[in-house]
Amino acid sequence: MILIKLNLTNFLFNKLINSLFTLFGVVTLIFFLFNVLPGDPAQMMLGQNENSQQLANVKKKYGFDQSISTQYLYYLNDLSPISFHSNEEENYTFLQENKYSAIELIKLKSHTIVFKFPYLRTSFTMQGKKVSEIIRNTLPNTIVLAISAIIIAIIIGIFLGIISAVLKDSYIDKAIQLISVIGMSLPSFFSAILFAWFFGYVLNEYTSLEMTGSLYELDDYGERYNIKLKNLILPAIVLGIRPLAVISQLMRNELLDVLNQDYIRTARAKGLTEFNVIKSHGIKNSLNPVVTAVSGWFASLLAGAVFVEYIFGWNGLGKEIVNALNNLDLPVIMGSVLVIAFMFIIINILVDIIYAWIDPRVKLN
């Protein structure tokens, strides 16, 4: 028992260390990828109204007048929970209250070491609005969309997988498999355009669904926001098509494999009806690969919602990324990509912990 606990602890420690290195690699890649792009960030911030003095002031304020290596160190310092800050007001790393929410740890002669929330900097195009605030306002909508999509995928995918397995080699089975293949191969942006046009425009009189819309919309008087759940239906269905197709295939194949096991034959020999055999023994023992698929797909949906959100006008993080790309708003792009990567890593760690808890072989390997 002690050996198992030690193996599990070592496993989790190794996963945490590997994840930190992965996150560091992602941060480095994001920084250098966007800093080799053509264009001057200071000019992007000022637009067409800049003059030489304004340009110099902005470059000094945001550290754009420093070398790439120095800017990289500034970027790491901004993102790190424990960071060093100069006591000189003219220095980029000066501890400004409007930039950092920090707790002082150690005060030195020329620097202060603090504990803070990661600082993702400010938007180029939104009048200095904090990137963290933009993400805080849009990420919940993306999470709601991803959760809705995965719920749709689980319910319909498992149901279709069971029907397909029970009616193996029938026309219904072949039709479900064909639909699954199409669902897995169909790009999400094409599905979004097709669904928005057909259900939101052609059949609008019957469905009452709109081509675009978000979770919260202003009322007719422009006084308050109301929840519009019907705007969630089309984007959630479109985003859930691919995981639905995968889950239905996994459920079908696993259920067929389970139904050929010896204990299923024993249950049949005892006189249980086929319905009870499938319900009590088949389905329960076929869900492991589905759980695996769901945990992996949920992280993918957070990143894959970009085009779906933009096409349906869903005010989530994906739509914000596309808008930032159109406006060359680099801090918003970098911060959003970094948050998505961080969520990927966290979800993968949680999945590995679940595996280690469920399957002893993971603890030993």
Regions found by a protein language model. Give the residues of each.
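Hydrophobic alpha-helical segments of integral membrane proteins
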Residues: 8, 12, 16, 54, ...
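An internal, D/E-rich "acidic patch" concept
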Residues: 4-5, 65-154, 158
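Transmembrane alpha-helical core residues of multi-pass small-molecule transporters
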Residues: 18, 26, 152-153, 180, ...
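N-terminal signal-anchor/first transmembrane alpha helix
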Residues: 1-67, 137, 154, 163, ...
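Membrane-water interface segments at the C-terminal ends of transmembrane alpha-helices
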Residues: 30-36, 66, 179-212, 238-244
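Short, hydrophobic secondary-structure boundary micro-motifs
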Residues: 45, 88-89, 121-123, 191-192, ...
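Hydrophobic alpha-helical transmembrane segments of membrane transport/permease proteins
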Residues: 23-80, 84-100, 203-225
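Alpha-helical transmembrane segments of integral membrane proteins
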Residues: 9, 139-144, 148-172, 188, ...
